[in-house]
Regions:
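Sec-dependent N-terminal signal peptides
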Residues: 1-5
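Extracellular glycan-recognition regions
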Residues: 17-230
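Boundary at the C-terminal end of the N-terminal hydrophobic targeting segment
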Residues: 7, 13, 17-18
Length: 230
């Protein structure tokens, strides 16, 4: 399985139309501030990603707009195009009360992973009995200088939106990226849930990674990358 994952990354770098990372094997991944393991969830092989032991105790980091972690996909390379992935996420057992099951994708990650743009969902907000929480169901942010709290304070409502979500249910995410523009489609909807026209890191290239926030248990399956124009 490891060879298949590496082959996908190698072929993608040569410009092959669409490459698949099945996410059914755990070797070769590069986790940062999270744990990753193979799992079976609701009848599907997947990888399970959770925050490191003790990370929830530092939940104030998340509240101040930082925190979370990534799992870099080996030899992935991405500039413009589409990212498709299935994710199922929820707050983990004993997570802080304000945990929402934060999970999504980081893209254009440099080798040192010191900065990246990312987009994610908050599954427990999707059907909350509170309109403001519903409006915060999907989020774009950029690590480390434009995290969610900063963006919300400076541009309320611009980088997050509502989408119907169910905690723990498999949810399909499709992310379209072109230059400094990003579109997020959820569950194969014909119209995007979230539109961003000013990606904070600009028009760059890098790796792709699975992303979760603290207090999260998330499962990822069948990630595909398709370069623009292929």
């Amino acid at each position: 399985m490891l060879s298949a994952v590496f082959l996908a990354g190698q072929l993608l770098s040569r410009g092959v139309a669409a490459q698949s990372f099945p996410l059914d094997a755990c070797k070769g991944f590069q986790p940062k501030n999270v744990t990753v393991e193979c799992a079976s969830y609701r009848g599907r092989k997947a990888v399970r990603v959770t925050s490191l032991p003790g990370a929830d105790a530092a939940y104030n980091m998340q509240q101040s707009g930082t925190g979370g972690g990534i799992v870099l996909l080996p030899r992935s390379s991405f500039h413009n195009g589409t990212i498709d992935v299935d994710v199922a996420a929820m707050p983990r057992v004993h997570a802080p009360a304000l945990a929402r099951g934060f999970a999504g994708i980081a893209f254009r990650v440099p080798p040192d992973a010191t900065r990246y743009d990312y987009v994610y969902i908050r599954p427990t907000n999707g059907r909350a009995d509170d309109q403001e929480r519903r409006n915060h169901s999907a989020q774009y942010a950029s690590f480390p200088n434009n995290e969610w709290l900063k963006l919300r304070k400076e541009s309320p409502g611009k980088y997050e939106s509502y989408v119907d979500l169910v905690p723990g249910a498999w949810t399909h995410l499709r992310i379209e990226i072109n230059g400094v523009r990003m579109r997020l489609y959820v569950n194969r909807a014909s119209q995007p849930t979230l539109l961003v026209n000013d990606l904070k890191l600009g028009d760059c290239s890098g790796a792709v990674a699975l992303w979760i926030g603290v207090g999260t248990e998330a499962y990822f399956a069948h990630l595909q990358l398709k370069p623009q124009g292929k």
